[in-house]
Curated annotation (Swiss-Prot):
Ranges annotated as biased composition (Basic residues): 111-130
Biological processes annotated in GO: translation
Family stated for the protein in its record: Belongs to the universal ribosomal protein uS9 family.
NCBIfam families: PRK00132.1
Cellular compartments per GO CC: cytosolic small ribosomal subunit
Name used for this protein in its record: Small ribosomal subunit protein uS9
Species assigned in the record: Staphylococcus epidermidis (strain ATCC 35984 / DSM 28319 / BCRC 17069 / CCUG 31568 / BM 3577 / RP62A)
């Protein structure tokens, strides 16, 4: 028998997370490692569990994630975005609560590019009067 599986793709900064939700006990696996081994801070783990808290589905699904690019925070938020999209695929009635919590919106903020003649995106070289 084919197993029921809900998929969602989440993005944040340079991170892309491919998320699969499978009915289970609430285990989260990121890149074939437990989420507590993969993410260094408890706050990030709480952050990516937010879609389950909003929809009151904590412990109903096992989460399998493949994520690459960016740092820990960007990856955690990409996973959160992917989980929200996968939950929406599982039950379209979650749309209202997920939308109100802002979990379906892709955060558009990206790193600003470095400009020529400047040290960073906006930081100019030190000015010397003489």
């Amino acid at each position: 028998m084919a197993q029921v599986e809900y998929k969602g793709t989440g993005r944040r900064k340079n991170s892309v997370a491919r998320v699969r939700l499978v009915p289970g006990e609430g285990n989260i696996t990121v890149n074939e490692r437990d989420v507590r081994d993969y993410l260094p801070f408890e706050s990030l783990i709480l952050d990516l569990n937010q879609p389950f808290d909003v929809t009151e589905t904590k412990g109903n699904y096992d989460v399998l994630v493949n994520v690459h690019g960016g740092g820990f925070t960007g990856q955690a938020q990409a996973i959160r975005h992917g989980i929200a999209r996968a939950l929406l695929e599982a039950d379209p009635e979650y749309r209202g609560s997920l939308k109100r919590a802002g979990l379906l919106t892709r955060d558009p903020r990206m790193k600003e590019r470095k400009k020529p003649g400047l040290k960073k995106a906006r930081r100019s070289p030190q000015f010397s009067k003489r």
